[in-house]
């Protein structure tokens, strides 16, 4: 979660993207570039991936992201980071710094700096080639 001022909350989990109709699988929290992003829940950093220079369009749109595995196997995902301050395998507690929000048009963030936060029911399924179902974060993160 961005620490400090959240200037607005964008599309929710049930919203579809304008133009493409793709589902939005998280919530966008807008805050100034460079704002510290903190862990919503305690867990273990499962992966830190930098998709900014990837050839895969989905990875490019995600930019730099961090996945934290929390209790019950759920994944908390933080996309559009300018830098990550954690490494894979690291344990984090709620409120620990994960990274910082990227500037606009960097790290797949679009026109305004924000962190895209999502909760997934489970980790990546190699057979389905997909992550677990998205869960509305407001029901999981109190």
Segments from the language model and where they lie:
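Acidic, glycine-rich catalytic/binding loops that coordinate metals and/or anionic ligands
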Residues: 1-2, 84-96, 113-142
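Surface-exposed, glycine-biased beta-strand/turn segments
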Residues: 1-65, 94, 103
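Short alpha-helical segments in extracytoplasmic peptidoglycan/chitin-binding modules
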Residues: 18, 78, 98, 117
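Conserved beta-strand positions that form and line the central face of beta-propeller blades
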Residues: 28, 77, 100, 134-136
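Short histidine-centered loop motifs in beta-beta connectors
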Residues: 32-33, 38-39, 72-95, 123-124
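Zn2+-dependent peptidoglycan hydrolase active-site motif and core
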Residues: 40-85, 109-116
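A short, conserved strand-capping beta-turn/loop at the end of a beta strand
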Residues: 96-108
